[in-house]
Amino acid sequence: MSTTVQPVALIMGASRGIGRQVAIDLSKNGYAVMLAAKTTSDASKTVPFPPDPNSSQSTVNTVEREIREAGGCAAAVAVDVRDAAQIQNAVDETVRTFGKLDVLVYNSGAIWWSSVENTPLKRFRLMQQINPEGLYATVQACLLYFEKNSWKGRIVVVSPPIYSRFFRGKTAYAMGKVGMSVLVKGLAMDFVRQERSDMSITGIWPASSIESAATEHNKASDPSRKKDLRKPNIFSDAILGMLRAPTSTVNGLLDTDEDFLRENCGVTDFSNYSVVPGATPRRIMPAKFPVLEVAEQDDEGQRMDSTKLRAKM
C-alpha cells in the first residue's frame, strides 16, 4: 500500500445530488476521494453518460467514472450505513486504497417529514439507523485512523443548526438530525478537552433548498418551485471553505452554506447558485440561530468517565 500525496476524503452518501457534487468538487480541488453509498452499478454500461445526477442511474460507480475521466483520483465502495461492519470496511478500504484518511464527509441520510402520529415506528427506526447511528459508527471507525495520523483530520456532517422551529411537523426526522448536531457539538468539546487542536468536526445545512433527488418530486408536481432552488455547488463550495479554515474556526460549528460563505469566504453575490437565472431562492432557515452556551459553560463540575469507572469494577 502506497500513501497518496494528495489529501484523502471519504464521502458517505456520494452517489447523487449533493454528495456527488461534493465528491466532484473536492476532486477538482486536489483531493483523492473514496465514494461510498448503497447504490452501485456497472458504470461502463450507463447510457447516456454522465447520467442525470439526481436520478437512480447515478451511483458511486458513475461518479467515480466522471471523476476519473476528468483526470481526478477516485475509488468507490458499496456501504449500507445501517451495518457497522460495512461502515468499517468502507473506512478500511479508503486507507487500503489511498494509504491514509484526512477528511470524512457524512452525507448519508433518510428523510420522512410527518407528524408523530403518521410516522410508523419502522420508518422512525430506519431514520435513526441511517442518520445518527450511521454517523456515530462512521465517526468511531474513522477516529482510529485520525489517531494514527497524529490526530489530524476534518469531519463535516450534514446536520442543522439547533433551533426549535426545526422540530415542527417532522419530529421523528428532527430527533435524528438534531442528534447528529449534538454529536458535532459534543465531539468538538472532546477534541478541545483532549487538546487535539488539529481535529475539527463541523455541521452544515442548506440555507435555501438545493436541487437534488429529494426535490425532484416537488419540481414535478409544481414547476414554479424551481425558482426556490440552488445548485448543489453552493454546498460543496462551503464545505471546501470549511476544510480550508483553521480548525479553531470550524470545530463545533453548526452553520448554513450561505452564511459560512458570506461570513468566512467573502462571498456577497449568490446569484450564480440559483437554478433559475435571476431568481432569488427563498431562505428556509432562520436569519439568526439561538446561542447554545450558558453563563456557566466552563463549569464541568466533577468529571465522570464511565469507561474508567467500569474498569475499576
Regions found by a protein language model. Give the residues of each.
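The beta1-alpha1 cofactor-binding region of Rossmann-like NAD(H)/NADP(H)-dependent oxidoreductases
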Residues: N54-S58, A78-A90, L121
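Conserved glycine-rich Rossmann-like NAD(P)H-binding loop of the short-chain dehydrogenase/reductase
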Residues: N29-T62
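Catalytic loop of short-chain dehydrogenase/reductase
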Residues: E147-E195, W205-I210, T215-E216
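Conserved mid-core segment of classical short-chain dehydrogenase/reductases
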Residues: F49-N61, A110-R125, K148, G169-A172, ...
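Conserved glycine-rich cofactor-binding loop
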Residues: S15-R16
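C-terminal helical subdomain
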Residues: G203-I204, A220-A311
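Catalytic Tyr-X3-Lys loop
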Residues: D102, A110, E117-A137, V156, ...
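Amphipathic alpha-helical dimer-interface segment in Rossmann-like NAD(P)H-dependent oxidoreductases
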Residues: D92, R96, I130-W151, A188-R193
